[in-house]
Amino acid sequence: STKKKICVLGVMKELGERSVEIHQEMYDYANEITDQILLVGDIWTSIDVDKTDSVLIFDDHEEIYDYLVSVLDENTILLVKGSRSTRMDLIADKLKL
């Protein structure tokens, strides 16, 4: 069976003046290789994202964690990227990844 791929993208605060452009590139790449994208942080409102069930925007890492607990199983691959300021490391820690 094919595994479902979920990508969690948090804001990457260290990118400087190209921040929006780089976040857009990250989103576009994730959109090509994953089944679902979970976004956290205010920059995603400046990014051209699909308004579908496969793209969800959350206010913080705790909301994403609660969602992930309800959908993760042995047939799911989880990819997480973001700066420590958006606490993406806590998602991995709490899920024991």
What are these regions (language model features)?
Residues 1-97:
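ATP-dependent carboxylate-amine ligase
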